[in-house]
Amino acid sequence: GHDWGDQYIRRTGQCLRDNTPAGTVCARLSGDEFLVLFHGYRSRDAVREKIDCLTKAMQQSVALLPSGNALHISLSGGIAWYPDDGQDWETLKKYADFAMYQVKHSEKGRVEEFDIGVYNREAYAERTRREFRQLLSNAQVFYCFQPIFSARSGRVVAYEALMRSDLPTLRSPATIMKLAREQGALYEIERLTFTKALETFDSLCRAGSVSGDAMLFVNSIANTCLSHEDGKYINSHWHELCRRMVVEITEEEEIDYEALERKRNAPGFSGMFALDDYGSGYSNENTLLQLAPRFVKVDITIIRGIDTSPDKQQILRNMVAYAHPRSMKIVAEGVETAAELRTVIELGADLLQGYFLARPAIVPGAIAPEAAGIIQELQRRKKD
C-alpha cells in the first residue's frame, strides 16, 4: 500500500545519501524519481566510477516488506553531461530523463548515458506519429496524376493517382503506409485514398484538365476492404468514375483472395484490377492466376536498362506472350529513356508510363514531344 511505497522511497533516499560523496546534490523529484548532481570532477571516468559504486550499493540495499521479507532496491537511471549534452539545467534534466526512460523501456536496473543520436531518432519518430494522426484527422493528402499512354498511338488512356503529403516527415507514401500498418490505420488510409483520389480527379475532369474518357488507376491495400456503407458512399458520389476505375494491387504480404473478390464486387466498381510491380519479387504467378487482372504493370527493375539486357527482354517477351491471349494488357512502368521506350514497344507492351513520357503532376501534362515522335516513328515502320 501507500505506507509500504513511502518506506521504499525513504530507503532509496537513504541509500543515495549514504553512498554519494560529500558535496553531491541528491533530491527527490516526484514519485520514485530522484536526481543526483555530481560536480567538481576532472573527468567523466571519475564520475562513472562513483556512479558504479552507487549502483552496486543500491543493489545490495533492501527494504523490508510488511511480511518481513526483504526486497532489493533496483535502480534505473540516465546520465547527461555538462557542458557537452547541455549547458542549462532544464536541458540536462530533460536529457537525463530521456536516457532513464530508454532504460525503463528496455532492460531495467541499468544506468545509461544520454545519446543525442537516439534522442533525435526518437524525437523524429514521435513527430512522425503526431503528423500521421494529423494527416488522418484533417485528410492532409493531395494527389498527383501520372498519365499512362497507348503504345500504338501515344494517346492518354489512363492516369495513376499518386498520394502526396505536405507534412514534413510524411513526404513519402512508403512512410505513410509503414505508420498505417504500425498504428492499425490501414482502413483509414484505404478510405482516404479512394475518396480523395476520386474527388480530385473528378474536379480535373470537370475543369477539362484531363482526358474525359480516361481510366483512373488507384493504389489499393490488398487485404483491406471498404465497408458496404463506404462503398455505397463512393459510388453515389463518383458513379461514372467508379466505372472507369482500375484498382492497383501490389503483393507485399500474403493476399486474402476473398478480400479481393469483395473489392471486385464493390458497388459500382468496374471490376478491373492491375497487378502492380510484377517481376519485383512480390508479385508472383499465383497472384497473377488468382487475381486475373486486366492490366499487368511490369516493375521498373525489369524496364530499367531493358534495351541492353537480353534477359530482361526475354522476361518481357514471355509476359506479353502470356498476357495477350488472356486479354490482359502489359503496362511498361518506369520508362526513363528513349532506348527503353523503343525496346518495350518493339517487344509488345500495350501501355507506357514513366518520366520519359510525362511526370506526375497535380494537373498532368501531355506526352513529351520526343516520346510522341518515337511512338509515331515505330508505328510508321510497322505499317511500312
Kindly give the residue locations of the regions a language model identified.
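Conserved long alpha-helical elements within nucleotide-processing catalytic cores of c-di-GMP signaling
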Residues: 1-18, 27-31, 35-36, 45-52, ...
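Catalytic-core segments of nucleotide cyclases and related cyclic-nucleotide turnover enzymes
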Residues: 2, 48, 67, 82-108, ...
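Alpha-helical scaffold within the catalytic cores of cyclic-nucleotide enzymes
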Residues: 13-17, 46-67, 94-95, 193-205
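Catalytic core regions of nucleotide second-messenger enzymes
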Residues: 27-29, 58-75, 104, 205-212
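Catalytic strand-loop-helix junctions within cyclic-nucleotide turnover domains
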Residues: 37-47, 65-70, 74-92, 117-121, ...
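C-di-GMP signaling machinery
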Residues: 83, 98, 102-144, 152, ...
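EAL-family c-di-GMP phosphodiesterase catalytic domain
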Residues: 151-155, 165-169, 209, 219-225, ...
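Catalytic core of bacterial c-di-GMP phosphodiesterases, primarily the EAL and HD-GYP domains
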Residues: 157, 187-262, 334
